[in-house]
């Protein structure tokens, strides 16, 4: 995993759960919430999890109206970009303009070599249900953020009802995207309660639903 990892995906893709799980599993220093609309990381219980694991949370701070064409977040979000001893996961907003918040950091980001921007896909979400929709969403994100997506995360699921075949179906769709855009599948997400035997593409993330649980 790179020192800086930006996790992107459409609303409801599961990117926030993945961000938390990766931060815990990979012992990341910072998790940066760049979602200025939906405060998924702000529950007290989830913050306790971060504190127990020595993960610093940087939350979004709106400096202007929510509907601004160029929303800005706290300057603290830039700290991992300029201090190369800090590892961080950036969780982008899943709204239509979620990638725009990165523009204020783009000059710093482009100087970093040890960085990935990963796109999370659940093909059972209508916005990313097939190859063409996924490619369109990725290209839109790249246009907004002025950055390139470097990897794909297969998070195809129907929560606890998910079957191995459904995860494989998501992999098949993402294989098509991967070949067309030349972007590898770097992670496949499987809930920790499932014991699927298939060797999926990329590294397997055994997902614990911490965000959904702590949000309640």
Can you say where each PLM-predicted feature lies in the sequence?
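N-terminal phosphate/diphosphate-binding loop that engages ATP/GTP or pyrophosphate donors
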Residues: 23-69
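Walker A (P-loop) phosphate-binding loop of P-loop NTPases
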Residues: 12
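Conserved catalytic-core segment of NTP-binding enzymes
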Residues: 97-201, 214
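Conserved lysine of the Walker
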Residues: 15
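Hydrophobic positions on the alpha1 helix immediately C-terminal to the Walker A/P-loop
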Residues: 18, 22
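Walker A (P-loop) ATP-phosphate-binding motif of ABC ATPase nucleotide-binding domains
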Residues: 4
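Hydrophobic anchor at the beta1->P-loop junction of P-loop NTPases
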Residues: 7
């Amino acid at each position: 995993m790179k020192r800086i990892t930006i996790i992107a995906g459409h609303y409801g893709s599961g990117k926030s759960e993945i961000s938390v799980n990766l931060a815990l599993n990979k012992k990341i220093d910072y998790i940066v919430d760049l979602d200025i609309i939906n405060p998924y990381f702000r529950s007290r219980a989830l913050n306790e999890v971060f504190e127990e694991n020595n993960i610093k949370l940087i939350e979004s701070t709106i400096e202007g109206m929510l509907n601004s064409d160029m929303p800005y977040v706290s300057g603290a979000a830039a700290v991992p970009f300029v201090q190369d001893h800090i590892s961080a996961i950036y969780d982008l907003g899943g709204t239509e303009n979620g990638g725009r918040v990165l523009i204020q950091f783009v000059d710093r980001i482009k100087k970093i070599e040890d960085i990935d921007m990963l796109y999370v896909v659940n093909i059972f979400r209508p916005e990313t249900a097939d190859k063409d929709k996924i490619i369109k969403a990725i290209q839109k994100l790249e246009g907004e953020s002025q950055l390139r997506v470097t990897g794909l995360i297969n998070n195809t699921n129907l929560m606890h009802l998910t079957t191995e075949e459904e995860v494989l179906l998501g992999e098949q769709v993402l294989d098509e995207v991967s070949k067309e855009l030349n972007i590898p599948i770097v992670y496949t997400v499987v809930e920790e309660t499932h014991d699927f035997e298939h060797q999926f593409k990329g590294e397997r993330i055994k997902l614990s639903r911490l965000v959904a649980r702590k949000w309640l």
